[in-house]
């Protein structure tokens, strides 16, 4: 046997590293291993990091600080399946940390994560990749990245996965994504509704809940509602409601149904299948407040469609809603009130709530919960709009007091709704008086000062409805309510400006309030508003005109027109034309100015400080200088007229300037005779008496202070004894005439005589009225001239005097300012040529009165002779 030779052991290759077993207890060491080229090391390191991250948020932060995220992102695309799986699992856990999410967005790993959703990947990878996406999708930027990288389609596919965790994570991610409109539209393209509906059958409540929430969101879109209907989605939802064991899903199921009911076809379908009745019964009989609340919300959403309201009314939804008002849960009360608000568009529902509903809503106005009070007020606002019966019902239920208390609420919506209800109530006079007795004018001031434009608008409208009588306006004025109302005229909001203008127009109904509004600057603000083509409205123009009607001096200066309803009273003055935006100086300031070259200011003032002459007859009938604005109670019978016809013009009617022209009519003959008689009467007086009268008149012209010597001095405008005499004379002589045309003609002749008589057209340039006016200004030491002092007047002097006297005896006439010193009066008269014609009376016609060339002549408006009179 041969000798055994010992085999030599070959040494290991020099380039091979001997195996090294390492046991590490530091996360930092394991993080370093993530850069290893060995797949086994990478897999074990990832597994260790996964276990470490599962232990809590602090560990996730530690891994982030150690720089583990960036090398892990590279492992998502590793060739080794185990490494890739473990890395994906880590990101599923880490992505719940906000700082990690932020870093992942910066590293743009979304494409790599979505790639893990491929069908060929393991279920575990699907689970953690979808978990990562679910965590990431909670933020908007990540949603965009998921959508842009095509993540929606694989997520929808995974809804059919056999693994419940994959379904849950995918559904959660989809729910987050569909909050964005683009994703919802894409969802319809991908036909995602059938797999989502299938998840409603899942044995896991969390999956069912996520599916319902997702359906609730996508059902906001019409196309999605159609797809739900076509896929029998409502049947699934109704089954859930009918299953008591699924009561934890009822709230979300109702939310989906609420959105679906906005679709008319869906509404019809659910009604035909009996689902609507089940829904109402479910809402009324459920003991869970949130279910009742969501049921009421479903009704509210659906009730915005008129056909849906009709169907609800047929199903007697009103009874259900009234029952829900009695719930102990505030959320249910709010939802029921909102549903009633929506159903109010149906007239039948409105009538039903008259007896049942309004009393309960009034009680809710007293709730401690501000939101409940607001919702109840909204329902009452809709119930009482254009419905006097419901407004009465609210008042009978003692609703006025809580509504006025609600005006001081902290919620703007509650204030606006309460103001609306009060406005609706105030449309009826008995209710308006009741509201006024509850101190509405004081309570509305705070809403008028609100910064909310809706509240401002509704408050101004409430003022419009409640300030319809003097007492209410006085209370508003005394409470300081006019100031915030005037400020609202400056609002940039069209609705606020319109309603504030309307309120100002109503408040300007009495002189004191109108004057206070003007003092606060309402007239100036409205003038500025009306200049703007975009800011003005019909109410601002009407309010401006209403205020001007209480300041006729300003109105005539600005507009050059006074209508027959604009009655000239003492204190009126004609300053002449002023441009828009120019401020008209007050009379006192004008009186205290020195004479100048400016146009004379004509003053109307019949008030006097002396008694009338003892020679005047019938002192008891008409007081000296008394203002008469209406002739309705002063008309004499025709018998009296004939009896007194012999003195149409009594003593003092003559003119200091002789009229040498021949009279043009019989009436002028009477005038001439009367003038001659008066002239003779004047000549019989001695020079001393004339001088004495002149001195007295001059003394009376000087502005006086009442109660001189006392500390309280009141300025008075210059008196005008001549004008006082005119008023007395026309009242005695012209007022008794029963024929309106004769009245106008006689008054025209009277005015002409007092202003220098008839003037032939060719002699008009020689009529030296300017010198006369200048002499008066010098004599009175003022630019303000009482109208009675003017003895040589032209068009605008005579037209003003005619209007002032006509207003005293009830002759309706307008005053129109023309160009170059022209002015004229217009009257409305029946055409005499139609007398005796059978049939209805024709419309009266407008005439211009001749006060210059043929005093008393009447010319049809826009006729050639009238145009020659009005225009140069």
Curated annotation (Swiss-Prot):
Lipidation (S-palmitoyl cysteine): 507, 518
Protein name per its UniProtKB record: Armadillo repeat-containing protein 3
Compositionally biased spans, kind Basic and acidic residues: 675-693
Compositional bias of kind Low complexity: 626-635
Amino acid composition bias (Basic residues), ranges on this chain: 636-646
UniProt-annotated stretches for the region Disordered: 610-693
Function: Essential for male fertility and sperm motility. During spermatogenesis, promotes the autophagic degradation of excessive ribosomes, providing energy resources for mitochondria and thus ensuring sperm flagellar motility.
Keyword Ligase: no
Superkingdom in the source lineage: Eukaryota
Species whose genome carries this gene: Homo sapiens
Disulfide topology: none
ARM repeat intervals: 15-54, 57-96, 98-138, 140-179, 181-220, 222-262, 264-304, 306-345, 346-385, 388-427, 429-468, 470-509
GO CC terms in record: extracellular exosome
PTM summary: Palmitoylation is important for its function in autophagy.
Annotated gene: ARMC3
Pfam families, per database record: Arm, ARM_ARMC5, EDR1_CTR1_ARMC3_pept
Gene Ontology terms: biological process: flagellated sperm motility; ribophagy; spermatid development
Oligomeric form and interacting partners: Homodimer. Interacts with PIK3C3, PIK3R4 and BECN1. Interacts (via ARM domains) with ATG14.
């Amino acid at each position: 046997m041969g000798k055994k030779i010992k085999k030599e052991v070959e040494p290991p290759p020099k380039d091979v590293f001997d195996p090294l077993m390492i046991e590490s207890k530091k996360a930092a060491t394991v993080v370093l291993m993530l850069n290893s080229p060995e797949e086994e090391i990478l897999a074990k390191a990832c597994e260790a990091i996964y276990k470490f991250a599962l232990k809590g948020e602090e560990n996730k932060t530690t891994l982030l600080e150690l720089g583990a995220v960036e090398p892990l992102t590279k492992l998502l695309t590793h060739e080794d399946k185990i490494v890739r799986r473990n890395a994906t699992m880590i990101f599923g856990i880490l992505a719940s940390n906000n700082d990690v999410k932020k870093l992942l967005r910066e590293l743009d790993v979304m494409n790599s994560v979505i790639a893990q959703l491929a069908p060929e990947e393991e279920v575990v990878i699907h689970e953690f990749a979808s978990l990562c996406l679910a965590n990431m999708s909670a933020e908007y930027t990540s949603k965009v990245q998921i959508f842009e990288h095509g993540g929606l389609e694989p997520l929808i596919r995974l809804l059919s996965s056999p693994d419940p965790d994959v379904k849950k994570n995918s559904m959660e991610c989809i729910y987050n994504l569909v909050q964005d409109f683009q994703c919802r539209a894409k969802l319809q393209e991908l036909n995602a509704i059938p797999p989502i509906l299938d998840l409603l059958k899942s044995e896991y409540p969390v999956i069912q809940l996520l599916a319902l929430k997702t359906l609730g969101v996508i059902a906001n879109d019409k196309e999605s509602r159609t797809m739900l209907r076509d896929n029998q989605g409502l049947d699934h939802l109704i089954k859930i409601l009918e299953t008591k064991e699924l009561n934890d899903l009822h709230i979300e199921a109702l939310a989906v149904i609420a959105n679906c009911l906005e679709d008319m076809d869906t509404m019809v379908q659910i009604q035909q299948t009996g689902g609507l009745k089940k829904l109402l019964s479910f809402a009324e009989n459920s003991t869970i407040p949130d279910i009742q609340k969501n049921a009421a919300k479903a009704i509210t959403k659906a009730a915005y469609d008129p056909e849906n309201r009709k169907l609800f009314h047929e199903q007697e939804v009103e009874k259900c809603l009234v029952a829900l008002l009695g719930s102990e849960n505030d959320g249910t009360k709010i939802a029921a009130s909102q549903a009633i608000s929506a159903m109010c568009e149906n007239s039948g529902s409105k009538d039903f709530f008259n007896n049942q509903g309004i009393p309960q809503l009034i009680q809710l106005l007293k709730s401690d919960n501000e939101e409940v009070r607001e919702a109840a007020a909204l329902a009452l606002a809709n119930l009482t709009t254009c419905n006097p019966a419901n407004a009465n019902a609210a008042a009978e239920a003692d609703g006025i007091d809580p509504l006025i208390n609600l005006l001081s609420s902290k919620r703007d919506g509650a204030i606006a709704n309460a103001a609306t209800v009060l406005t609706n109530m105030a449309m009826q006079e008995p209710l308006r008086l009741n509201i006024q007795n509850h101190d509405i004018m004081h309570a509305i001031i705070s809403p008028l000062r609100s910064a909310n434009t809706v509240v401002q608008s509704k408050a101004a409208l409430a003022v419009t409805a409640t300030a319809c009588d003097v007492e209410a306006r006085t209370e508003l004025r005394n409470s300081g309510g006019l100031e915030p109302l005037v400020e609202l005229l400056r609002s940039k909001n069209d609705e606020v400006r319109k309603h504030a203008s309307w309120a100002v127009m109503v408040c300007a109904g009495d002189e004191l309030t109108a004057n206070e509004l003007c003092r606060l600057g309402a007239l100036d603000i409205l003038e500025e508003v009306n200049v703007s083509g975009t800011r003005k409205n019909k109410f601002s123009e009407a309010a401006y005109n209403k205020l001007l009607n209480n300041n006729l001096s300003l109105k005539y200066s600005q507009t050059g027109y006074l209508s027959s309803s604009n009655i000239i009273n003492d204190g009126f003055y004609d300053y002449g034309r002023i441009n828009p935006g120019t401020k008209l100086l007050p009379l006192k300031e004008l009186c205290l100015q020195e004479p100048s070259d400016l146009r004379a200011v004509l003053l109307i003032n019949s008030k006097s400080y002396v008694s009338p002459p003892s020679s005047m007859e019938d002192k008891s009938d008409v007081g000296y200088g008394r203002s008469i604005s209406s002739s309705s109670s002063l008309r004499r019978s025709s018998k009296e007229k004939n009896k007194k016809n012999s003195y149409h013009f009594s003593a003092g009617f003559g003119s200091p300037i002789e009229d040498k022209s021949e009279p043009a009519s019989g009436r002028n003959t009477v005038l001439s005779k009367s003038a001659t008689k008066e002239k003779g009467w004047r000549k019989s007086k001695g020079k001393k008496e004339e001088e004495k009268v002149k001195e007295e008149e001059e003394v009376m012209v000087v502005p006086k202070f009442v109660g001189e010597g006392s500390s309280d001095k009141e300025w008075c405008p210059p008196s005008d004894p001549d004008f006082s005499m005119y008023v007395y004379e026309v009242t005695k002589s012209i007022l008794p005439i029963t024929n309106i045309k004769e009245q106008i003609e006689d008054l025209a002749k009277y005015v002409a005589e007092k202003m220098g008589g008839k003037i032939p057209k060719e002699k008009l340039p020689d009529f030296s009225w300017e010198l006369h006016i200048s002499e008066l200004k010098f004599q009175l030491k003022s630019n303000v001239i009482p109208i009675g002092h003017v003895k040589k007047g032209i068009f605008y002097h005579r037209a003003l005097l005619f209007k002032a006297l006509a207003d005293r005896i009830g002759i309706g006439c307008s005053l129109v300012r023309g160009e170059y010193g022209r002015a004229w009066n217009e009257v409305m008269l029946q055409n005499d040529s139609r007398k005796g014609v059978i049939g209805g009376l024709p419309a009266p016609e407008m005439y211009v009165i001749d006060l210059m060339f043929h005093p008393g002549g009447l010319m049809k408006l826009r006729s050639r002779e009238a145009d020659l009179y009005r225009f140069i």
